C-alpha cells in the first residue's frame, strides 16, 4: 500500500546523548523523505555533539566519542537538514514526545527557525497504541505468550496481572 500524499513526508529518527531534550544532544539523524509520487530519498548524518557521549547512551546506539570526533557539529549542518525537511510533514516513532522537541531544541541552539506551524506530525507510536488492544488479555499474550483463560473472572485477572508484572519486570530489570 502506498501513502496518498499531497506533500512530502519525512520519516526520521534521532540517536542522542540522552533523553533530556534541553540538555542532551543529537549524535545521529536519519531522514527518509517520501514524495507524493512515491520517490524516496534518504540521508543520514553523524553529528559531533560537542559533549562526551555517556556510556549508557553508547550501550543503546553504539555511537562512541571516537566515531563522532571528526563528524560535523549540529550547528554546521542544521541549515542543510532544515532545507531538506522544510517542505515536508514529519513522522517518527515517539516523535511527538521526543524526536521533534529534540530536533527543535537543536535547531534553536543553531539559530535555525524550525517552524512546525504548517506541518503535520505523524507519531507512529501513537497510532500503534490506538490500534493495538490495550487489555489485560493483550498484555498477557504479549508478556507471557499465553492466552488468558477465564478473562474477567477476578481470580484469573488477578493471577494474570501478577504474571504480566513478573514478566515485564524481568524485561525492565535486564
Identify the residue ranges that each predicted region occupies.
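Acidic, divalent-metal-coordinating active-site segment for phosphoryl/phosphodiester hydrolysis
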Residues: 153-167
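Active-site flanking residues adjacent to catalytic metal/cofactor-binding acidic residues
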Residues: 12, 122, 156
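A short, structured active-site edge motif that brings together acidic residues
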Residues: 116-128
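Acidic two-metal-ion nuclease catalytic site recognized across multiple nuclease folds
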Residues: 1-4, 164-174
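Short, charged, surface-exposed loops that flank catalytic or proteolytic processing sites
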Residues: 151-154, 174
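Short, glycine/acidic-enriched loop or turn micro-motifs at the edges of active sites
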Residues: 16-18, 126, 160
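Conserved non-catalytic scaffold segment of RNase H-like nuclease domains
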Residues: 1-118, 133-152
Amino acid at each position: 500500500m502506498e501513502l496518498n500524499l499531497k506533500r512530502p513526508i519525512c520519516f526520521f529518527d534521532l540517536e542522542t546523548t540522552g533523553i533530556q531534550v534541553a540538555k542532551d544532544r543529537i549524535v545521529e539523524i536519519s531522514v527518509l523523505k517520501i514524495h507524493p509520487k512515491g520517490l524516496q530519498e534518504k540521508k543520514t548524518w553523524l553529528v559531533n555533539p560537542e559533549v562526551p557521549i555517556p556510556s549508557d547512551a553508547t550501550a543503546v546506539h553504539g555511537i562512541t566519542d571516537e566515531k563522532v570526533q571528526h563528524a560535523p557539529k549540529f550547528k554546521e549542518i542544521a541549515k542543510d537538514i532544515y532545507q531538506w525537511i522544510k517542505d515536508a510533514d514529519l513522522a517518527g516513532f515517539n516523535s511527538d514526545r521526543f524526536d521533534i522537541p529534540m530536533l527543535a531544541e537543536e535547531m534553536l541552539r543553531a539559530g535555525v527557525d524550525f517552524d512546525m506551524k504548517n506541518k503535520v506530525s505523524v507519531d507512529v507510536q501513537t497510532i500503534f497504541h490506538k490500534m493495538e488492544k490495550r487489555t489485560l488479555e493483550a498484555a498477557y499474550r504479549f508478556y507471557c505468550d499465553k492466552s488468558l483463560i477465564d478473562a474477567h473472572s477476578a481470580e484469573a485477572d488477578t493471577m494474570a496481572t501478577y504474571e504480566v508484572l513478573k514478566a515485564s519486570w524481568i524485561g525492565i530489570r535486564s
